[in-house]
Structure formats: C-alpha cells, structure tokens
From Swiss-Prot:
Region (Disordered) location: 1-21, 413-435, 1193-1220
Gene behind the chain: MED14
Subunit details: Component of the Mediator complex.
Name of the protein: Mediator of RNA polymerase II transcription subunit 14
Start-end of Basic and acidic residues biased regions: 1-11, 1205-1220
C-alpha cells in the first residue's frame, strides 16, 4: 500500500507543465482608450481655437464645414475603439491560440535539431582503427623482412667502356640487319646507323634517332612487337636565322631542338607510334609535326608584324594548328576584304614543300606577275598539271571563302618543284649549291598588296578610257592616275597598297567627301547585307568610276553655280524632281539626238553620246529676282562631258511633289552658223543649214552668255504667260513668228486697214560667241521652232479667233493682239480689230479709264495697256491681259444688252460703258413705272447688276425703311443679283439668261408689291384713326384694333422666300386668360406662287404690250393646322368673302364674253387636295427659280385629279357658269387654294384683309 500510494503521488506530481503565455507586443486596452481620449480632446481644443481666430476672415459655411470634418474624423476613430472593445470579449480564446501556435513551433524546432545531431554522428569515420596489413605480414612471414625500395641510396657498379662499346656494336649490327630486312621504309628517309642508334633525316624537316631494346632479329612484320624501335632524340632541320631573325628552311646547318617538356611528350607519343605502326607511322607523325612547326614559325612572324609594324590593323591572320594552314586576310579594314574575300593561304603542298595560294576577291590567282614574284620567294617553279596549258580558276562562293581556312593542305591544282633538284634554277650558284634565302613574310605581304593594287588601278584606268579621252585621264604610276576634273583643274587619284583605300593628293573638301564615299560600301547595300553578301571587285571598280564622274560633276557644277551667282542668278535647292519629271527634260535631248541622227548620219559619231551623258547628271534650278515664283531656269550638267544643257520651265508643288507644268529647251548654234539680218530687210527669214546643239561647252559660259540668257529667259516667260492666259480664257489663237511675218499681207488678208501705231522695231544682235535659240514644246509635232535670242526687246503678234468675244455681226472673225517689250520692265499690249453697226458713246473718260478707243468712221476699235513688269510679274495670280479682256467683256455685254433692249422695244434712257438706264412700265398701273440701272460687269468673271435709279446698292442697310414698297422691290433686286452672280459662276453648266426675261419678271411682280402696299396703307389708316379720335365710336373702333395694354391686335409682313414664292403673314395678338400682360402671338400665313400661263396668247416682239403673263396661286394650307383651330371663324369669313368674289367675277366674265363674242375657253377641272401641274414646285435655289421662270415657250397643262364626292356638285355648277375663261381675268378655286390672274390679285388681297377686320370686330362684339 505505501508503494502504491507513493506511486500515485509521483504520477500526480509528474503532470506536464503549462504552455507558456505570450505577452510580447501586446498593449492593454485601457491604454488605447486613454490615448484616443486624449487625442480627441486635443483635436477639439485645436479646432475651437482655430475657429475663434478666423471669425472675420472666413465665412460661416466654411467654418462649419471645417468643424464638421473634425467631428467626423473623431467619430471614425471612436468607431475603431468600439470595435476593439467588442473584440476584447473573445480575446482570451485568441490569446490561447497564439500560445498554442508558439508552443508547436518550439516543438518543431527541437525535433529538427535532434535530426541534425543524429546525422552528425556519421561523420566520425576517421576515429576508427585501420584494417590489418595482411600483405606486409605475409612478406615478413615468408621472406623474413619487408620488401622496401632503396631509392638509389645503395650504389650499383658502373659499366665498363668495353661493355658499352660492345653493346653499341651489337646494337649497330642488329639495326643494320633489321633495316636491311624491312621493305616498308619511307622513301624520304635518309638514315645512318652508328653509336647504337639509327639517325633518320628528312630534308628541310627533321632528324630523329631510334634504337632497339634487345638483340632479336625480326624478319616478319607480325613479330615486330617482340622487339620494337624506341625513340632516342629529335630535332628540326630548320628554324630562325640568328643573323637576320627570319625563318630559314633550306639550310640544314640551322636546326631547332625541342625543350625538355616538349621532348618528353614527343618521346611518349613516338614510342607509342613505333610500337603500333612502325617506321611509316613515325614518318607520318614527325612529318606533320614538322610542318606544323613550320607554319607555327610563320604565324609567329605574322603576329609580330601585326603588333609592331606598319601592317598593324591592316591584315588578319587565321592559324589552324590541326591543318597546318595559315590564312592571311589583307586589307582587313576595306569592305572588299572584310569577309575574308582577298587572302593568301600558306601551307604544305603534296610534295611536302611550303607553298601558297592567292585569292583576290574570291578568285584564285594563277599565272600572273604577282605569282611569279611569290614563286621566287618560295623557291618554286610552277607547271600546270594539264601539260602546260593554263586553265582558268573558278570563282568560289562566300561560304567557300570563309571556309578556306579549313581547306586541305594538298593544293591539287598545281605542283611545285624544289629548286635544289633543278640545275637551271637562277638561285643556284656556280658550285651547284643552292643559295639559302630567308623567308620574309613582310616581303610576301608587300608583293601581294602591290600587285593587287596595281591590277585594280589598271582596271580603273582602262574603264575610264572608255568614257573619257586620253587627255582627261592618264597613268602616272602603277598606283596613281592623273584626272582632269574640270577644264582648268586636275588632280592625282591613287590607291594605298597597305590599306587598299583610295585617296587624292592635296585633296579639296569635295575630293575629301568623294574619297569617303569611294572607301565606303555602295549605298545600295545595307549594313546587314554588307556583312553577309559578296561584293565583287568589278562592282567596286564601277562604283569608284561613278564617284570619279560624280566628282567631275560636282566641280563643274560649282564652277557654273559661281558664274551664275556673280551674274545675279539665285539658286533654289528646295526643288527635287522625280524620275518621271526628269524624263520630261531628257525627252528633249532624245528627240534632238534622233533628229540629228536623221539629218546628219556621218557626223553623229562626233557628238557626245546621250546615253553616257544621262548616266550621271545633275539638275540645278535658278531664277531672277523679279521673276514669278514658279518660273525657273534649269541647268543640267554631266560628269562625263563638260557640256551643259538649259531649260526655261514652270514648276509647282502639287501635294508635296514638284511637277513641271511647262518647259522649253534652249538650243545653241556654233560661230560658223551665225547669221544676222539687216535692219531694213523684210523678207521671210530662212534658216541656213547649220548644226543645232542642245548643249554648250564650258569655255563659252562667259558673262555675255549669262547676260543674254537672262534676257531670253525673261522673254520666254512673258511669252508663255500670255499664251497660258489665252488658254485659260478658252480663247483660240494663232501665234505669229514676228521674225517671219509680213504686216501688209496679214492685215490685207483679214481686211484690216489699220496702221499699227507701234511699228516693229529693228533689233540688233549682241556680239557673243554663241547664238541662242529656243525650242518650243507647246506643239505636239516634232518640228522645232527657233527664236533669235540675242535681242534687246521682245515682240509678238497673235491672231485671236472671235468666237464669243464680240458679236460677229458687229465685228469680225479675227482680232489682233500685239505685244512688245518696250523696256526691260515695261510691256505694251494692244488688242484691235473691226467694229461696226453700232453707235456707242465713247467719252474721253472711257478712253482714259478703260483704254478703249472706237473709231466709228473707220469701223475700228483698239484697247491698249502698258504693264509695269516690276510690280506685277512677281504676283502669284498675275493676269497681264486682264484689263484688255475686262474692257472687251464690258463692250461685249453692252452690245448684247442694247441689242436685246432695242429688239424688245424697251425704253433706254441713257447708256455708257458702265451703265444702262431703262424704264420698266407697270401694265396694271401706269403711275408705277420704275427706273432701273443695268450696271455692266467690271471683270470678265462678274455678272451684270440691277439697281434702282434712286439707289446705289442693293443692301438693305442703305435703303429708306420708311418706304416699304421700295424696300420690297430692292429685296427682289437683291435676289435677282444673287441669281445673276450664281449663273455667271456656273455658266459652263447653265443656259444664258435673257435680260428681257428679267425685266418681264420685274413687271409681273409689281401687282404683288402693290397689293402688300395696299394692306399696309389700310393698317396705317386704321392706326391713324385710332390714335387721333377720342369719341365713343372711335373708342369702339380702337378697342377693335388694340388690346387693353395698347398693343395692336393685327400686324402684317411680306416674306420673300424666293423669286417665285412669296408669303403674306398676318400676326394676330391676343390676351391669354385674365393676365393682361401675357400676350399670345399667332400668325396666319398665305403663300403666293407665280405660275406660267402662256397658252391663251402668242408672244410678240413687245413684251410690255403682251397680255400673256403669270398666274398667282394663293394657298391657305400652311395656316390650316391644329394650332389655328381657334381661328375657325376667321377662315370661314375669308372663304365666304372669296366665294362671293368668285360668283361676282363669274357673272362679269360671262357677261363680258357674251358681249365681246370671244372664243370659248375649255373649263378647268377642279383639283382634289393637291396642287395642279400649273402650280410651280418650290425650288431649292434661286437659280432654279429664275431658270424655270425664263422658259416662256413651253405649254404646261394642269394635271387631272379625281375630285372628292362632296365637291363634284359645286364643280359642275361652277363649270356651267364659267363656260369660257379669259386669259387676263382668271379666278379659280382649287379646294383651299385659288388660281387667279394678276389683275385679280388686288381684289383677292382686299377680301382677305377685310375678312381679318370683320373677324376682329366679331371678336369684340
């Protein structure tokens, strides 16, 4: 029992300890509440202090907003505190979880530490005892002592000399026997047996000594393994010459021994080879080893040159030890050899001689002078394998060239004969011994690069001779050329054999720029293609020649540009022409060459070939200070020849591209072809047969040439500007050659008797070396027209075809335009011809203002003008003939309008060159005539304008607003003038508008204006009565017309929508409800439309006496809408009054028809809720209105429509009563529309106005 009790007590006391409680980083909740309370008190205190300080500075809204923000922030903080307090109720459980997590992490750490400690126990292997040495124990047991090395501490006995000599003799005997019995000794072995070893020599390669390890005589190769040969010693039979420091291959006295480390490695390798392959394997191994060492010595010398010589950076070396091959890529900085395209290979040929192969730009070189010099250096004599016949080498690809460093050492295309075996060799002395020469790699590179540079310059020289003469290019040295780059300049062009780059001696900036381009890859190749592509040497030479031509081009262009700049020509470098535009210029040269080839086939070889000229040329653009902005002198020069070509052209920029709109080439005559006319000579100029060239030599580009070129170019520009202006005006003309025409013949042919005031002046030629002619390309034919250029003045004559310029009845089919350049900046223009059958006032004011003179006696007129070119020629839109043709247009308009007015019997009160005053009569009211002024256009693009006699303009700002009738008529004129302007601007798509039709329209529109005038008069009369009378009756009337606030109930206005559409608007004002200040304004719109009605009368010559005119359609449809239902009584009154008028007019017409026995008219059928075909459809523009109005010859029948059933009975009754219709007295009802003649318009308007007054009176009652 005590034990059990004791055990129980131990169990209770050994219970597990409590989990440790975590209190780190925990803050009591009381502290948080304390801190937040203090912070809230601090913020409230600060806010109250701030608000008390800014009482006067801030508004109450801003202060309240500030205090509200503080309260909101504090509220958010206390919400967080409240959240923490709520969470505190369950914080004990969370704390237990934290304690558990911490305890689990501690237990995990203890278990991991236990695993690491257990694993560390395996690292005590070194503390174990070693195993027993059984082998040593057995030796002791068996021999009585361990077998230990002595390390030569115990000296052995030396061999005696006799023993050694005996052994060596035995070895010599064994070696002699074995060499005698062997059949596979290499042919190149030269061996000697002595001193117990066999000394084997291979000339110019190596010497090796071998021996055997026993005295066995081996006669069977299969038993060779029983007694193999062993390596004794080795040395190279070549090396560096201590006297010259160069490599010697043909002197056996110079040898090279291997260092100890290399000797040991070679001994081990040779013994293995002798054991497995015998002497043949020995030869192959040492032969390769010797060749590798030869190539190594060469590579070492090349590396020395690459570091410490002038060759540094100018060649690349690729040394391959596994193939005993060296590839030297010279001119490594040049793009031609950048990818190993020009290189020399050094290696061992099939005869074991040091040999080479030379590749120039991817082609194998064989048999040229450079190869002969290299053969002497390498002591080689070449012979072709095909019995001495030289074969061409194939071009290798880029991949093959790059892989050339991996080629086989056997050069199968050629063989080499060592000079020692040739008794005829030049390097053999009199004793028959070969003179040993050191191999100089610097000399090898010099020979290669010099010969390559020489071949390039020779090819450049030969190709330059095909383009230039021998005086322009000559060979100074194998590496230098003398070039004639301009008539007065020459330079030396050379190549640097060391680098392969070209250069000029004492270069100018232009030559330096060309040198940089020559030594750079062609621009056609990108950087990627340069690294990957193969650039043939022929392409490089062609590119060099092109750049030389470009140099000549730039130098010649600079000289020409300097001469032009000194003679006041301005260069323009902005213009860049495309190939298509340049072809327009070269087309002149092609046509001229074809023409010269046809005319003179024998001398065509003496001219410069056009194809060579066009291969390289440059175009420059020049202009004079006073020239128009788009005119230029074009100069073309070529790098092949010193000749230059000249054009005068107009060039403009269209959508960013420069376009040649017109051009003329200038042609030149030689001195032997010069011909001048005497001042009094009037016969036709015949061109002599002379050679005409499009180019001029550089020697003739002197000051006199450019002075004459300036005058000629200016004349050609003026000539073309006039030609173009005539073409823009669509005027047909013929340009006469002033040098060849006869005045009397021309004028007599066209019956022109006028003596020209400006006689043709005698012009003299300027004494210059070259006569300048111009070829005109305006004609489509291939013939070339020549103009004598060296003149001080310019004269020209045009025959103008009088198509629409003047009426043929009053003039002639041909007019004359004379142009003369009086001075350098003054040009005289004159247009003259016949003018008859017309009497026009031609005052001195017209002559001075319009430069127009009319000679009625001689039936002749002329318009002249003097133009100051210094002020107008440089304007962008200069029209030299503007004044002349504006005056001619005004004269043409005056003649045509007067002719129309006279034929139509319109009263013309006055006329001049500016205005025509006419009288328009009102056929319905004789007291309403109007005086209209027809203002003639100032410009050819302007139209005529209509003005009232008492007004000077059609704008409403200057019209007297007190006269409403004048205002409305002026508005009509404004619409007409607008239509005339639009018709003029679109004249190519529209028909001509007759002035008679316009005048007739003004006559027909008068009744409408008079009707509106009558309405305004009635309203004015009522207003006057209401304002002056104060009795009861008048007060009652005033209350009818006015509202209680004094505002009138009725207003009237006329809206002119278009020329054929007008609108009568009655504005009805009324009070709404009991509020007297609130006014509602309604409007009643009545549309008036003009409709043609010509089929009852035939037109005659006098339109004012004609009864035919327009009908008026009055429509109420726009007013019969839902908003106007409250005016139902008004419309009933209107329709009632109009129906009464219809009945009255019907009776009058019937009575009048019976009394006058007029021709019965067919009844017009009623229409159903739609417009008749007579009703003109409203147009969308003024042009359509007046065009339709002007057509008076078309008869339009009303469209028949089915009437409604409730209208048929009234229609039948009306048609019976109106059996005949008078054309001048028509009044027809069409549902809610009315069709009436002009004389009934006043009655209809009166009835409508009276109805409005009746409605107002009923409303008042």
């Amino acid at each position: 029992m005590p034990n059990g009790k004791q055990q129980h007590e131990v169990t209770e006391s050994s219970s597990p300890p409590e989990i440790p409680h975590i209190t780190a980083n925990m803050i009591p909740l009381s502290n948080i509440i304390k801190y937040y309370t203090q912070e809230a008190y601090k913020q409230l205190t600060t806010a109250i202090e701030n608000l008390s300080m800014n009482v006067n500075e801030e508004s109450d809204i801003k202060r309240k907003k500030y205090f509200l923000n503080v309260i909101i922030n504090l509220r958010q903080d206390f919400i967080k505190v409240y959240t923490l307090i709520k969470w505190a109720s369950i914080s004990k459980d969370v704390s237990k979880f934290i304690d558990l997590l911490n305890w689990f992490r501690i237990q995990e750490f203890h278990f991991e530490n236990l695993i690491f400690q257990l694993n560390a126990l395996t690292g005590y292997n070194a503390a174990k005892l070693p195993n027993s040495d059984i082998i040593t124990a057995l030796e002791v047991l068996y021999h009585g002592r361990p077998k230990l090395p002595s390390y030569n501490y115990i000296k052995s006995d030396n061999l005696s000399p006799q023993k050694i000599l005996e052994t060596l003799n035995d070895l010599n005997l064994v070696l002699m026997t074995r060499f005698a019995l062997m059949d596979n000794i290499p042919k190149r072995f030269d061996y000697e047996i002595k001193d117990g070893r066999a000394y084997i020599r291979v000339s110019n390669e190596f010497e090796v000594s071998i021996t055997v390890g026993n005295d066995l005589i081996i006669d069977n190769p299969e038993e060779y393994y029983k007694s193999p040969f062993y390596f004794i010693d080795f040395k190279f039979l070549f090396g560096a010459n201590p006297e010259s420091g160069l490599i010697t291959f043909n002197d056996d006295k110079i040898s090279t021994k291997l260092p100890t480390s290399s000797h040991k490695k070679l001994e081990k390798l040779v013994n293995q080879t002798l054991l497995t392959r015998g002497l043949q394997g020995l030869y192959e191994l040492l032969h390769k080893y010797s060749n590798s060492f030869k190539i190594y010595l060469l590579a070492k010398q090349f590396q020395t040159l690459l570091i410490n010589s002038r060759w540094r950076g100018n060649f690349q070396i690729n040394y391959q030890t596994n193939k005993s091959l060296i590839v030297i890529n010279y001119w490594s900085q040049h793009y031609l050899s950048r990818n190993w395209k020009s290189f020399i290979e050094l290696g061992i040929d099939s005869h074991s001689n040091l040999n080479y192969r030379w590749f120039k730009n991817g082609q194998y070189c064989f048999g040229d002078q450079g190869n002969n010099e290299l053969d002497k250096i390498f002591h080689l004599q070449r012979r072709n394998s095909n019995n001495g016949v030289t074969t061409s080498s194939n071009t290798i690809s880029t991949s093959a060239m790059i892989a050339g460093i991996r080629r086989s050492t056997e050069l199968s295309n050629e063989t080499a004969i060592v000079d020692d075996n040739d008794n005829d060799n030049d390097d053999t002395n009199n004793t028959g011994e070969t003179e040993n020469e050191d191999l100089n790699v610097d000399l090898i590179l010099n020979v290669v690069v010099n010969q390559h540079a020489k071949s390039i310059m020779s090819e450049i020289y030969s190709q330059l001779l095909t383009r230039f003469s021998e005086t322009d290019v000559s060979m100074v040295s194998p590496h230098q050329l003398l070039l004639q780059i301009s008539p007065k300049k020459s330079t030396v062009f050379a190549i640097n054999p060391l680098t392969g780059f070209f250069y000029f001696i004492d270069p100018t900036p232009i030559q330096t720029y060309i040198t940089k381009k020559i030594n750079s890859p062609p621009p056609t190749l990108s950087q990627v293609s340069i690294k990957q592509s193969f650039i043939p040497e022929s392409d490089m030479i062609s590119y060099v020649i092109d750049q030389i031509i470009q140099l000549r081009l730039e130098v010649f262009n600079k000289e020409v540009n300097t001469k032009l700049a000194t003679t006041a020509w301005i260069n323009n470098g902005i213009i860049k022409l495309s190939d298509h535009e340049l072809s327009k210029l070269t087309q002149f040269l092609i046509q001229n060459e074809e023409q010269e080839g046809d005319d003179n086939e024998e001398d065509s070889s003496t001219n410069t070939r056009l194809d060579s000229v066009l291969q390289s040329f440059k175009v420059q653009f020049y202009r004079r200070k006073n020239w128009p902005s788009s005119w230029f002198l074009i100069n073309m020069i070529s790098g092949v020849t010193t000749k230059s070509f000249w054009w005068v052209a107009r060039i403009k920029s269209i959508s960013g591209d420069w376009k040649i709109q017109w051009a003329q080439i200038i042609k030149f005559h030689g001195d032997n072809a010069k011909q001048e006319l005497s001042p009094n000579e009037s016969k036709v100029f015949d061109k002599p047969k002379r050679t005409v060239d499009c180019s001029i030599e550089s020697e003739q580009l002197n000051f006199e040439f450019f002075k004459t070129l300036s005058t000629l170019s200016s004349n050609l520009i003026l000539d073309h500007m006039i030609l173009e202006e005539l073409q823009v005006r669509s005027i047909k003309f013929i340009k006469l050659d002033w040098e060849t025409i006869d005045d009397n013949k021309i004028f007599s042919k066209f019956k022109q008797n006028h003596d020209i005031s400006l006689k043709r002046k005698n012009s003299h030629n300027i004494n210059i070396d070259v006569n300048v002619d111009v070829a005109d390309n305006t004609s489509t034919t291939t013939n070339t027209k020549y103009i004598r250029a060296p003149k001080l003045k310019y004269e020209s004559m045009f025959l103008i075809y009088n198509d629409k310029l003047l009426p043929i009845y009053n003039s002639a089919t041909i007019l004359f335009l004379k142009i003369e350049l009086v001075e350098s900046n003054k040009m005289y223009l004159k247009l003259f011809g016949n003018l008859r059958n017309l009497q026009i006032k031609n005052t001195s004011e017209d002559i001075q203002k319009l430069h127009l003179n009319i000679d009625e006696a001689n039936q002749y007129f002329e318009i002249d003008n003097t133009v100051d070119l210094s002020t107008v020629i440089n304007e962008p839109k200069t029209l030299l003939l503007n004044l002349i043709f504006n005056t001619l247009n005004k004269l043409n308009s005056l003649i045509k309008i007067l002719d129309q007015l006279n034929k139509s019997n319109v009263t013309v009160l006055d006329n001049s060159m500016d205005n025509i005053t006419i009288n328009i009569k009102d056929k319905y009211n004789d007291n309403n005539d109007k005086l209209i002024i027809i203002k003639l256009p100032e410009q050819a693009t302007d139209s005529i304008q209509l003005l009232m006699k008492n007004g000077s303009t059609t704008t409403t700002d200057e019209i007297d607003l007190r006269n409403n009738n004048i205002l409305e008529f002026e508005l009509i004129l404004k619409f007409l003038n607008q239509y005339l302007r639009e018709s003029k601007s679109n004249n190519h798509n529209r028909q001509q508008i007759s002035i008679i039709k316009i005048i007739q329209y003004l006559t027909e529109i008068n009744p409408i204006l008079q009707s509106t005038k009558a309405i305004n008069q009635q309203l004015a009369e009522l207003k006057r009565i209401n304002s002056t009378n104060n009795n009861n009756n008048n007060a009652k009337r005033r209350s009818i017309l006015k509202l209680s606030n004094g505002l009138y109930k009725l207003y009237f206005n006329l809206n002119i929508i278009s020329l054929t559409h007008l609108q009568l608007v009655f504005f009805m004002n009324s009070n709404t409800g009991s509020n007297l200040k609130k006014i509602q304004r309604d409007k009643i719109m009545i549309n008036l439309s003009l409709i043609k009605f010509d089929r009852f009368s035939k037109p005659n010559g006098n339109f004012q006496d004609s009864t035919n005119g327009h009908l008026i359609k009055i429509s109420f449809k726009d007013s019969l809408i839902n908003e106007n239902l409250k005016f139902k009584n008004l419309f009933e009154i209107i329709f009632k009054n109009i129906n009464e008028l219809l009945i009255t007019k019907s009776k009058q017409i019937k009575s009048l028809n019976q009394t006058e026995n007029q021709q019965q008219q067919q009844p017009l059928k009623q229409e159903d809720n739609s417009d008749s075909a007579i009703i003109k459809k409203e147009s969308q523009s003024i042009e359509d209105d007046l065009l339709d109005f002007g057509e008076y010859d078309n008869d339009i029948k009303p469209q028949q429509q089915e009437p409604q059933q409730n209208e048929k009975e009234n229609s039948k009754t009306t048609s019976k009563e109106n059996e005949t219709v008078r054309p001048d007295d028509i009044l027809i009802k069409l549902n809610y529309d009315y069709l009436l003649s002009m004389n009934n318009l006043q009655l209809m308007i009166n009835e409508i106005t009276k109805s409005c007054f009746q409605y107002l009176q009923q409303q008042q009652e």
